[in-house]
A protein has these predicted regions:
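Hydrophobic alpha-helical transmembrane segments of multi-pass integral membrane proteins
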Residues: 4-9, 35-50, 124-130, 150-157, ...
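Hydrophobic/aromatic residues within transmembrane alpha-helices
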Residues: 27, 36, 40, 87, ...
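C-terminal-most transmembrane helix of multi-pass membrane proteins
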Residues: 41, 210, 246-295
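C-terminal transmembrane-helix exit sites in multi-pass transporters
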Residues: 51-55, 104-126, 250-269
Length: 295
């Protein structure tokens, strides 16, 4: 069971991420991508700093922290959010989501090989292809559009940015707890987004639904989600984790059906089944490898 702890934590993190779309739907009129991303990271960092303070996880020398790695992780997340949110409207939500989610595992495999000379297994290639196909079916791209190709390029760049973050962030756990790492990274991302956020309308935050949206995004999809994923990366390869994160659109579809009354057809259910089996396949591979190493 211990071999599955890492993948399970990554999956739980992806389920937390999956509520992002739900909150954007429920957000009051006037909410925009930049200010939403800013408040998400700012609230997440504040909550995590409070948690780390009361649990004694801030007892370290700030001068000796791996600032280069922390800043690199923050830049990756900032780039991913800015590029994705600024371009997704031009290519369509369905196409943008599939490209972003689909690029990340392949990019993670490239970065893992370039940085650590790690090669993904045959099972990983099979499960990743199965999951990406499932995500495509869930989003019903037959009705989609590619839109501006330059915007599509930004979506691809966003996927590479997030994949690089997943690849390089586990090193931080050698010096910091996952909670402290995400608290610092989230604060750096929110500072980077602050200038752009100040140019956007923020009145929507003051409404009851606006406050609920901000706190849910900050606590669940930033503080809790990133912490779960980073803890999971202790025992899970970045390439495997990036594919497990394809559970996010599976969760998003589930929330839409259960809470928003959205309808999906037979093809959509086939896509959900494919993503589910790709996750089961990866977990089985992780368990098999662990038993082989123990022997």
């Amino acid at each position: 069971m211990s071999a599955l702890k890492g993948p399970i934590l990554v999956l739980l993190g992806s389920l937390c991420f999956s509520t992002t779309g739900l909150m954007q739907v429920l957000a009051p009129q006037g909410a925009n991508a930049v200010s939403t991303a800013f408040f998400r990271m700012a609230v997440g960092s504040i909550c995590l700093f409070i948690w780390c303070f009361f649990t004694g996880q801030l007892r370290f020398d700030w001068k000796t922290l791996p600032w280069k790695r922390l800043i690199a992780c923050a830049l990756c997340l900032t780039e991913a959010q800015v590029f994705f949110f600024s371009s997704v409207k031009d290519v369509g939500v369905a196409v943008g989501t599939v490209v972003y989610i689909g690029v990340a595992p392949c990019a993670a495999a490239i970065f893992a090989f370039l940085l650590y000379r790690k090669k993904p297994s045959t099972v990983w290639w099979l499960s990743t292809a199965l999951a990406i196909t499932g995500v495509v079916l869930m989003n019903d791209l037959s009705a989609g559009r590619l839109g501006d190709m330059s915007a599509l390029g930004f979506i691809v760049a966003a996927g590479f940015g997030y994949a690089l973050y997943v690849t390089i962030s586990p090193v931080l756990l050698e010096r910091l707890s996952a909670e402290a790492s995400i608290a610092i990274i989230s604060s750096l991302v929110s500072l980077a987004l602050l200038p752009a956020a100040l140019c956007m309308p923020m009145q929507w935050v003051l409404s009851p639904m606006g406050l609920f949206t901000v706190f849910d995004l900050g606590i669940v999809t930033a503080g809790l989600a990133f912490t779960l994923v980073l803890n999971g990366l202790k025992q899970t390869d970045s390439t495997v984790a990036s594919t497990l994160l394809l559970g996010e659109p599976l969760g998003a579809v589930g929330w839409g059906v259960l809470l928003l009354g959205e309808q999906i057809g037979f093809i959509g259910y086939c896509g959900m089944t494919m993503v589910f089996f790709s996750i089961v396949l990866l977990c089985w591979e992780q368990h098999r490898r662990s038993k082989t190493q123990d022997c």
